[in-house]
Structure formats: C-alpha cells, structure tokens
Amino acid sequence: MNKELLLGVNIDHIATIRQARGTRYPDPVQAAMDAEEAGADGITLHMREDLRHIQARDVRLIKQVLQTRMNLELAVTEAMLDFAEEISPEHACLVPEKREELTTEGGLDILTHRNVVEKAVRRLQLMGSEVSLFIDPDKEQIRAAVDVGAPVIELHTGCYADATSEEKQHYELQRIKEAAEFAASLNLVVNAGHGLHYHNVKPIAAIRELNELNIGHAIIARALFCGLKEAVRHMRQLMQEARLYVND
C-alpha cells in the first residue's frame, strides 16, 4: 500500500487580494477553514517581513481555529523568529526572502549561511516547532540540512514548474526524484512545493519518497471559477490518482 501524500494549502494569495484594496475581505481565516473542510491536511502561510499579504493577525487567528496544523513559512531574521516565538507554530519552514521578488525565487542556501540557519533551527525547536528547510534539490544542501539538525526539508520545485520544454522539465523532474531519494536515505521527511498546478502536479506526486506537497497559487486561481473547496478537492484527487500508479 502506498503512503498517503499530504496536501498543504497555501492561502497567501487570499491575503494578497485583501491587501490590494486594504479591506477586511477576503479573510484568510475563512479560507483556511474552508480548505481544511475540503480535505487539506494543513494550511501553509508565509508571513513576509514586508507584510505584503499575510498579517500577524492572520497567523494568530488561524493557529487558534485550525483542526489540522499550521505551517508557518518565515525568513531567517531576528524579527521573524521573535514572532514565531510568540506564536509557537506546530511546524515552521525557513525560507529565503528578498524584498524585490514577486514570490520565493529559490531555495535557502544553507551552505553559505550555515551558522545563522543552525541557530534558527535550534531556536525554533526549543519552541516546540517541527522545523523544515526550503531548499533546492541539491545533495550538498540536503547534507547541510542534516548537519544543522533539521528533520524535514521542502524541495523547491520551481525550476520544474517553470521549464519551457519537455526535455528541461524531464531533467528537473529527475533532479527532484534523485534529491528525494537521497534525502529519504538520510532519514529526512521530504516535502515539496512551488509552482505546482493542476497540469504538472502528477509526476511530482508520483515520487514515493515525498510526504507532502504545498500548493497555493494554482488552487486560489482555480477557486475563482469553481470555489475554494472544489479547487482543493480537485487537487487532492489528482495527487491521489498519481499515487495509485506508484509501485510498492
């Protein structure tokens, strides 16, 4: 029997729409509850330092109302770690962050920033958080994740999602497969995400070593036309179909 693949729904872009007009709606808290009701295994949200979408209020309320779990993405900065200490998220994912980027552009470079990342991992673990590191599918970065004490990694799938040819997409898929296998051999829990949508998720979902996919933009975009609950259910269905064809 194949291990179930979990779905974490990222609700950042519900907040993006709200912040565009400075209104109280649409409310990410309601979105989190609806996604959870539709079958999401967890809710992911990225509170950026510039507060362009998710606000502190959102994080506090979502943590209170969720029946599943909250995965808080945050930069490795003193301000964000102080906030995490206040919230004590069940799961925290350290991500790179640049103010000028539209979305996260790559994985965390643990090799370059090892001391800072290691201190952040320890601090979060002392809060009781399970820590993951958002990294590129690179063996050296995976080894570094083990070295700094992170039990979980999330593989950046952006290069796969952005590939403009079948050859390039196949190459990036193989990179992710090999990285997932390598990480699993080191006893890491392996998640993945970034840029995944309804037309490219199945090959990723079929990777047996993956534990969870975090998907946001595609689900929120689909929700405009069919509603959030249906969008979540459809993504889950595609992921489950992909797992049916994975050999034990």
Swiss-Prot record:
Binding locations of 1-deoxy-D-xylulose 5-phosphate: D12, H13, R48, H53, T103
Binding sites annotated in the UniProt record for 3-amino-2-oxopropyl phosphate: N10, R21, G195, G216, H217
Matching Pfam families: PdxJ
Subcellular location: Cytoplasm
Reaction catalysis annotation: 3-amino-2-oxopropyl phosphate + 1-deoxy-D-xylulose 5-phosphate = pyridoxine 5'-phosphate + phosphate + 2 H2O + H(+)
Annotated site (Transition state stabilizer): E154
Active site (catalytic residues): H46, E73, H194
Chief localization: cytoplasm
UniProt pathway: Cofactor biosynthesis; pyridoxine 5'-phosphate biosynthesis; pyridoxine 5'-phosphate from D-erythrose 4-phosphate: step 5/5
One GO location term (cellular component): cytosol
Keyword Cell membrane tagged: no
Molecular function as annotated in GO: pyridoxine 5'-phosphate synthase activity
Entry keyword annotation includes Ubl conjugation: no
Enzyme Commission (EC) number: 2.6.99.2
Transmembrane segments: none
NCBIfam families reported for this sequence: pdxJ (TIGR00559), PRK05265.1-1 (NF003623), PRK05265.1-3 (NF003625), PRK05265.1-5 (NF003627)
Family: Belongs to the PNP synthase family.
PANTHER family assigned to the protein according to its UniProt record, in alphabetical order: PYRIDOXINE 5'-PHOSPHATE SYNTHASE (PTHR30456:SF0)
Subunit: Homooctamer; tetramer of dimers.
Protein name: Pyridoxine 5'-phosphate synthase
Organism: Legionella pneumophila subsp. pneumophila (strain Philadelphia 1 / ATCC 33152 / DSM 7513)
Gene name for this UniProt entry: pdxJ
